[in-house]
Amino acid sequence: MAGVGDAAAPGEGGGGGVDGPQRDGRGEAEQPGGSGGQGPPPAPQLTETLGFYESDRRRERRRGRTELSLLRFLSAELTRGYFLEHNEAKYTERRERVYTCLRIPRELEKLMVFGIFLCLDAFLYVFTLLPLRVFLALFRLLTLPCYGLRDRRLLQPAQVCDILKGVILVICYFMMHYVDYSMMYHLIRGQSVIKLYIIYNMLEVADRLFSSFGQDILDALYWTATEPKERKRAHIGVIPHFFMAVLYVFLHAILIMVQATTLNVAFNSHNKSLLTIMMSNNFVEIKGSVFKKFEKNNLFQMSNSDIKERFTNYVLLLIVCLRNMEQFSWNPDHLWVLFPDVCMVIASEIAVDIVKHAFITKFNDITADVYSEYRASLAFDLVSSRQKNAYTDYSDSVARRMGFIPLPLAVLLIRVVTSSIKVQGILSYACVILFYFGLISLKVLNSIVLLGKSCQYVKEAKMEEKLSNPPATCTPGKPSSKSQNKCKPSQGLSTEENLSASITKQPIHQKENIIPLLVTSNSDQFLTTPDGDEKDITQDNSELKHRSSKKDLLEIDRFTICGNRID
């Protein structure tokens, strides 16, 4: 009977249809009775059915709800993982931005150092070579009757410009003697700190406006004085332009003197509050520049403006130190008192420029290699100004590119030096002569080093073709077609020979009815005056269309120095 019961139990458990599990439960309950009390009852067995797994899952779910705790949450947060390689391009771009920001200080300072030495070269030219060139031009003018009037021109155009610069420099220097520096110092010192801060900001804006318009006045004077006589008179005359240039240089020199006086008052203040406020003004410049959209040309213009501003600040600090040393009878101990303030002003200027350029390049996706292009463009100006037939003098080229006009600053520095240093006795005059020869040596050495570096930068940027491709000649009075205006490459000399052979040569005088071959230096072209081809294009197009923007760095000059937009 026990064997029959054991055989029937599986049949009862497995013979069911829909209610198989219920019948299986009954079979398990009937097994002890079916054994008839013979032997110990077998151990209960759990059959692997779907209902068992469902109940186990419900049991685990109920246990999971009851066991939710802060420890399990913290454990999940600490062990949760993620994979950055799913967004590899994004993180690679962010890493390159960090590397670009780290490269900005080095590349920017290399550009700044090169640009400052360019400004120094143009500034030393006024004190060293310009007086010698004026002397040679006057000597030619006085000795011209001895050689006869073989040429229709009494002087070369460059000599006329040199004489005009020298006369303007001398006249403005004597006019500056009527401005009392001591009275201006005490007048500014009696003002409140906030008023002086406002005055200093107004002076910075006025300096930019003067620099933007001043070179136009000087260029108009140079062109009016050297314009060929055959052309139709379309100007007011040389004398009015000359008086305008003298008035501009005099007013700009007074403006820079007020800036230097305000800075001197800040240095001599007891609590240094004014100096701190003036330094904080540099950090306000970050707010006005960082959050604007910048293109490469806009950044190039702003870099040139920063170079000019930094060099001007160095000269202002030199003037402040000279005035303070004069007041303390040239006591060298007082120089160490001024030294921390001078270093603080220079360090704040450098820090502001680095932060400003770093975030501008970050927000506008500009690489750090763009500063090498800017440096090559400045080097191109220097090399092209030393060519056999250059468009303009190098100092004027720097003025057009950066907005740095050396004449007003030179007038003020001469005025301060002559009033601060008294020359008495033969030994003092001998020291002055030796100092002048030292300036000439410094100018020559600086020019040689800059010229060598500039040729290197031009070759690295592969810009030699622009130096060796002069424009095609055309006779005046006849309109040239577009095909005739295309530049033809020069033959007979290689690029390296052109760079080495054409530098430091004097221009050859040609006939007036033939336009000479000039080096294509686009830096001296005015943005406001289109060429003949551009005039034809604008006449064919509608009047509502503006001229296309010039994207070549060599075509960007200082005409938009007061703003950030390049037309």
From Swiss-Prot:
Give disulfide pairs as residue numbers: none
Keyword Cytoplasm annotated: yes
Any one GO MF term held by the record is:
growth hormone-releasing hormone receptor activity
* Annotated source species: Homo sapiens
Specify residue ranges for compositional bias: Low complexity: 1-10
**Which residues, renumbered to this chain, carry the PTM Phosphothreonine?**
T529
Q: Which UniProt keywords apply?
A: Acetylation, Cell projection, Chondrogenesis, Ciliopathy, Cilium, Cilium biogenesis/degradation, Cytoplasm, Cytoskeleton, Developmental protein, Differentiation, Disease variant, Host-virus interaction, Membrane, Osteogenesis, Phosphoprotein, Receptor, Transmembrane, Transmembrane helix
What the protein does comes down to: Plays a role in primary cilia formation. May act as a downstream effector of HOXC8 possibly by transducing or transmitting extracellular information required for axial skeletal patterning during development. May be involved in cartilage and bone development. May play a role in the differentiation of cranial neural crest cells.
The entry sums up its family as follows: Belongs to the TAPT1 family.
- N-acetylalanine-modified residues are A2
Q: Which domain of life is it from?
A: Eukaryota
Looking up Pfam families in the UniProt record yields:
DUF747
Q: What is the effect of changing D353V?
A: In OCLSBG; causes mislocalization of the protein in the cytoplasm; impairs cilium formation
Q: What's the name of the protein?
A: Transmembrane anterior posterior transformation protein 1 homolog
Report the residues modified as Phosphoserine: S523
| Disease with which this protein is associated in UniProt | Osteochondrodysplasia, complex lethal, Symoens-Barnes-Gistelinck type: An autosomal recessive, lethal syndrome characterized by severe hypomineralization of the entire skeleton, severe osteopenia, microcephaly, multiple intra-uterine fractures, and multiple congenital developmental anomalies affecting the brain, lungs, and kidneys.
Task: Give the main localization category.
Answer: cytoplasm
One GO term under biological process is: positive regulation of cilium assembly
Q: Name one GO cellular component term.
A: ciliary basal body
Q: Which chain regions cross the lipid bilayer? A: 111-131, 157-179, 236-256, 403-423, 432-452
Q: Where is this region: Disordered?
A: 1-60, 466-499
UniProt subcellular location: Cytoplasm, Cytoskeleton, Microtubule organizing center, Centrosome; Cytoplasm, Cytoskeleton, Cilium basal body; Membrane
* InterPro entries, A to Z: Tatp1
Record's bilayer topology term: Multi-pass membrane protein
Task: Please note every region of biased composition (Polar residues).
Answer: 478-499
Signal peptide from the UniProt entry:
none
